[in-house]
A protein has these predicted regions:
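A short alpha-helical cap/connector motif
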Residues: 1-101, 105-129, 133-291
Length: 291
């Protein structure tokens, strides 16, 4: 019988934190000076950026609907195109990436390349986060994305296995949060060329690797940890990257959201008024023709 996303190999509990809540925790506790995001979609995660954080976001087809910071620089291109044409550190005022979030193409080789490119612009105290590293089922972890799939995570989980094998200098964990886990990597080394030098060799080994690799010892092979706030915080740097009142920064972000909602409300009112006016004009013209 064909497996579906509902046929999970572990119970997906609604009590587990959602990944956006965990990202919000990272932002509010670490107060990053700089933030880079690969895979923007509707802007839900980019909207979590606090005032004062310089942000760069990359997506070939961003469809931003959320209130993202005005200072955020959004590049409508693939991540490969971006890193070939731009100096990320320069875009961040010559500062390293404090926090990076990878949620782009859900295929191993793309996610690994994104990791390599982001690490080059990090510092030793930076944090890289990778979405979709703890797939809920074999169907969700397929390299083929069927339109009927909901939370497709692809084979990004292989990046964790790869880092454990080839980059034992890193601290790698996967927080078991909804919907499909969040990889947390610290101890980064921007001077390392191990992954880039072995990229083709690594891809030959990992791209064809089957989900059955996780059949026994999935938690150990992916360094699973609980996704509760206390556990996640224990994996992050102990000090924030900058000073600031968390309450005031969150208030500033909330104000940005309120302005966005107000702007949408005004736009809807204007559109409604425009439609009513056009209906009245059409009705007046119809009456004139009947005279």
């Amino acid at each position: 019988m064909q497996q579906t996303l509902a046929d999970t190999d572990s119970a997906v509990s609604s009590s587990r934190p959602h990944y956006r809540r965990t990202l919000d925790l990272v932002h509010t506790r670490l107060l990053p000076r700089t933030y880079a995001e690969i895979g923007v979609a509707g802007g839900g995660t980019l909207s979590l950026v606090l005032p004062g954080t310089a942000a760069v976001a990359i997506d070939p087809k961003p469809r931003i609907r959320r209130p993202v910071p005005r200072s955020a620089k959004v590049f409508s291109m693939t991540s490969d195109e971006f890193f070939a044409a731009h100096d990320l550190r320069r875009l961040l005022d010559d500062r390293p990436v404090d926090v990076g979030f990878i949620d782009g193409m859900h295929l191993f080789e793309f996610a690994l390349r994104d990791f390599i490119n982001l690490e080059r612009h990090c510092g030793p105290d930076s944090v890289l986060l990778l979405h979709d590293c703890y797939p809920v089922s074999e169907a969700a972890a397929s390299r083929e994305h069927a339109e009927s799939m909901g939370n497709w995570s692809g084979d990004v989980w292989k990046v964790i296995a790869c880092l454990k094998e080839h980059r034992q200098d890193l601290d790698v964990s996967v927080a078991d949060i909804r919907p499909s886990g969040l990889g947390i990597v610290t101890g980064l080394d921007p001077t390392s060329t191990v992954l880039a030098d072995r990229f083709d060799e690594i891809c030959r080994r990992y791209v064809p690797l089957e989900y059955g690799f996780l059949a026994e010892g999935k938690e150990e092979k992916l360094n699973r940890v609980d996704g509760d706030p206390r556990t996640v915080l224990s994996l992050l740097p102990g000090r924030p990257y900058r000073r600031g009142s968390r309450a005031l920064l969150r208030a500033g972000r909330d104000a940005r959201r309120r302005r966005k909602r107000l702007a949408h409300r005004v736009m809807r009112i204007r559109r409604g008024a425009g439609r009513r006016l056009r209906r009245r004009v059409r009705e007046a013209r119809r009456r004139l023709r009947l005279r």
